[in-house]
Amino acid sequence: MPSTPADINAIFAAGYNARDVEALAALYEHDAVVTNPDGSMAVGIDAIRMHLGQLVELGGFMTSHNRYAIPNGDLALVAADWEIEFTDGRERITGRSAEVVRQQLDGSWRYVLDHPGGG
């Protein structure tokens, strides 16, 4: 689990590259919200887990580079440039994300709001 807000997006990319939906879902609070590419929202961990399952089916290799991580108490605003590259000729996918993360009682950080295209 991320020990600082700046760690979370790199840990997400590692989970994506391992195709580990459960490791990815563990990065979210139970009632978190993720914005989907079509503008709809995945609300709550069950919907987020389904979203993540569809995401990892894309395959490829994800990298994520933080643009900033701004902490304020137990909350932080994080943004990153990310990309998924493919070896099968598909065009790479890129984006700029914006997330709100919250520090948990154990000191780790989890997503509260995740907007993969909101940066």
Feature map (PLM): residue ranges:
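Short glycine-dipeptide loop
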Residues: H30
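A beta-strand edge to alpha-helix "cap/lid" segment located at domain peripheries
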Residues: M1-A23, V33-G119
